[in-house]
């Protein structure tokens, strides 16, 4: 049976897989590092309810009805939760008699099942949270909505995805442990919404393989490319209309995160005299020095985290080796963006790639360029505050799905706490931007995807990649 009743409000009943939820109404007093040590009540990771007083402040992202909690990754009502589960478990294929853009509301949601399922997928409902047997207990505890390409959505809506999954299972039997609603990708690269696995871990002493990973930035206006980041419906507000206040404990935890950050300008020299022609080798060496400094700052950051004493050194090593590229990319897009897109862009402008470099540039590099340009544009529009950056960084770092962790459940609770705190802060600070929090969170899986794709970009192509990205970003911002 699915857990439909909201847990008791207060102390330990507000946990779960997290998402666009509120934290418990009143958190217990924090211990020495600002975190409570209590075990939160175990909830069905596929669907999490919230207390009545909190739920009244939310509306379903699918139909606008009263939301009862986080279901399969997004805030939704009981009706849409059940509809999505039945559709995926029963592999239903619907048809729309109109233009596939039917209005979704509480009164009209049953008129077109096709458009209802389509919106569930577009808003990020997570099929991996549905067990193949339909019982409670999600197969994947990834927090928040997932990103699905338009092509994959079309395969699901047409039934092609279900047919491929059936064929896959018939060929592989029980050796494949993925849910029939969520066939694991056979590609060597993670999908945009996938979690980082140990196969992508990079040894700390080998960060020269920084090659692949980082520094997202970019933006030309002619780029209409949107890499599957979903825009949330304007008529499905996430926030209550009344003014809110920020909980003192949330403020304290955010302050602790900010205290752990090194927000001083980067020390790597990036100034160069006019007229000097930068070579490929010189630019690559500069990129490596930047990666060195940024990585060092991430290591120092970990040691200052308020929950540092609560996790083992083994877990921290595992987390850092699996996420450091993403942390560097996130920081480059936010707190260090002025230097990266200013001073570094000026250096890359003095580098002229050869015809051979241009000719040999890979398709993987082109995809990374396009995604970085879009992501930079997204961050530039959002104007992420230091507080939001600190929370996003902690959320991304505390990835309980990484293999080899000894305290995955504790990581999940820490992740959820900062997820809720970030949501509280954005709702308090940006009351007129109801979609701001989901917009921020949807950037994280894209950062992971870009970091993974950069692994396939040859080292010698990085100088050209950064030149194109930084030039595009700086040029487009200058025109605004």
From Swiss-Prot:
Region (Disordered): 1-32, 131-150, 162-199
Binding-site residues, Zn(2+) 1: 60, 63, 77, 80
Chain ranges passing through the membrane: none
Matching SMART domains: HOLI, ZnF_C4
Domain NR LBD positions: 249-480
DNA-binding region ranges: 57-132
Name of the protein described by the UniProt record: Nuclear receptor subfamily 6 group A member 1
